[in-house]
Amino acid sequence: MELEARAEPRSPRAGRGEEEEDEDEELRLAKRRKVLCSEFAAVTSSDEAVASGFLAGSGWHLERALDAYFEAPMNEQTTAAAAGGGSAGPGSCIDLTADDTASNTSSSGADSKQQDDDSSFSLITWNIDGLDLGNLQERARGVCSYLALYSPDVVFLQEVIPPYLCILQRRAGGYTIIPGNVDGYFTAMLLKKPRVKVLKQEIIRFPTTSMMRNLLVVHVNISGNELCLMTSHLESTRDHSKERMKQLQIVLNKMQEESQSTTVIFGGDTNLRDSEVAKLGGLPKNITDIWEFLGKPQHCRYTWDTSSNTNLRIESKCKLRFDRLYFRPAAEGGHIIPRNMDLIGLEKLDCGRFPSDHWGLLCRFDVIL
């Protein structure tokens, strides 16, 4: 015998309360989806209609939607834009993965030659300005093009954001990628496979930072030599000079604590002024500023130069050596020696902007066998 289920009567006031909660939840969901659409559109240079289509198809998961977008052939991206009532736009014709095969083919000769040559290795450090979402897709492609061109063994990056990390993970398949965080903006280290063998890693948080800054430390082996690699983005702006100096002291202490049999290289966007280093009494005797070690070459002195780099479009013209590389050789002989240094990222892209508001630093090292 079936019994008819009857709902118990509820008061009109209780019903209104539940309806209001439902409406609030729907409003929060709508706002969240609008933010996701804006972020997707900014990264891909598409419109919100395209963003909505890819996000909806990926369960409103931003990273999955970006993966789907960058994996899609260009005609599918254009079709999605047309279906959404918008145009693909100038940015959406840039597919970061379309020329993967060509890039890998063109650089394979250089890669194999460098892997066979254990007498040298190269390193790039670069603040890629991921916080600037303008032309982000094309600027990211520009950075990846430099990585393909120079094929560095080690890359230090600062101001990486999650969508940019997705691009790097898809584009730089020949590298082990170690991020210093996964939220907000952070540093990342790229280590070429299989030449650079990762031994261990750690993240040291700066205890009094107000900008989520930390020190990413990775121990590796290159050509039989053990290295301790470190990168960081020290506290920004002139007003945070004291905090920046505290962070620098933590970095220098960590460099000195490492085993004397290990070569230590630190690099990143330090935001340092020379006067701040002087206030700390200069660098320890066993730690060298590589730019100074190489004779202070003027062509690569200023890595943040608003007189030449117009990305920020600010009227004041500043030239500062924010991006630096420090070196502590192994005590058991000079197995690794800095050879030269150059700036990269000096050419404007088709969008009329540079890959970043910072120039990158490319440094080459000799390995004494």
UniProtKB/Swiss-Prot annotation:
Organism: Gallus gallus (Chicken)
Chain positions covered by the region annotation Disordered: 1-26, 80-117
Region of interest: Interaction with 5' end of substrate DNA: 127-131, 233-238, 271-273
Residues the record marks as site: Interaction with 5' end of substrate DNA: 185, 304, 322, 358
Keyword DNA damage: yes
Gene Ontology cellular component list: cytoplasm; PML body
Annotated InterPro entries: Endo/exonu/phosph_ase_sf, Endo/exonuclease/phosphatase, TDP2-like, UBA-like_sf
Entry's localization field: Nucleus; Nucleus, PML body
Cofactors, names only: Mg(2+); Mn(2+)
EC id: 3.1.4.-
Binding-site list for Mg(2+): 129, 159
Main function: DNA repair enzyme that can remove a variety of covalent adducts from DNA through hydrolysis of a 5'-phosphodiester bond, giving rise to DNA with a free 5' phosphate. Catalyzes the hydrolysis of dead-end complexes between DNA and the topoisomerase 2 (TOP2) active site tyrosine residue. Hydrolyzes 5'-phosphoglycolates on protruding 5' ends on DNA double-strand breaks (DSBs) due to DNA damage by radiation and free radicals.
Protein name per Swiss-Prot or TrEMBL: Tyrosyl-DNA phosphodiesterase 2
Family: Belongs to the CCR4/nocturin family. TTRAP/TDP2 subfamily.
